[in-house]
């Protein structure tokens, strides 16, 4: 398993839509996104931890 996922891969992995993931990444203090140039990459471990501790999106 890769540590970094594209938005599309993260969507397939979690079942969350790409647009919702993009909105979540745009929130101040988002800890599961890293920018590689202009491309957003999702940190799988931090995304899992975020989802484990989140009641509602």
Mark where each language-model region is.
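A detector for short, charged/polar N-terminal pre-domain segments
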Residues: 1-3
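Residues within the helices of the helix-turn-helix
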Residues: 7-8
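Major-groove DNA-recognition helix of helix-turn-helix-type DNA-binding domains
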Residues: 12-41, 48-49, 55
């Amino acid at each position: 398993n890769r540590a970094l996922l594209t938005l599309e891969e993260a969507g397939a992995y979690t079942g969350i839509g790409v647009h919702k993931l993009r909105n979540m990444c745009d929130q101040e203090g988002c800890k599961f996104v890293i920018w590689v140039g202009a491309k957003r990459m999702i940190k799988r471990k931090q995304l899992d931890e975020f989802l484990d501790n989140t009641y509602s999106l």
